[in-house]
């Protein structure tokens, strides 16, 4: 399990590149930034604890 490096995306738009990540919630995100945006924008406490389960498809 990998901690996403969300600090590097603060105040920036996500890059358009596709580098799939599989979250510990079982959902796929098109890159690490997209996962960080989901974590940031979620109001659910459980979503704040999502990590990267693995790089690539779930």
Curated annotation (Swiss-Prot):
Skin. InterPro entries: Kazal_dom (IPR002350), Kazal_dom_sf (IPR036058). It is found in: Secreted. Residues 1-58 form the Kazal-like domain. The keyword Disulfide bond applies. One of its GO terms (molecular function) is peptidase inhibitor activity. The keyword Disulfide bond applies. This is Proteinase inhibitor PSKP-2.
């Amino acid at each position: 399990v990998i901690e996403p490096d969300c600090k590097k995306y603060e105040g920036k738009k996500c890059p358009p590149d596709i580098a799939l990540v599989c979250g510990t919630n079982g959902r796929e995100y098109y890159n690490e930034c997209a996962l960080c945006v989901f974590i940031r924008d979620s109001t659910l406490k459980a979503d704040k604890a999502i990590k990267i389960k693995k790089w690539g498809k779930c």
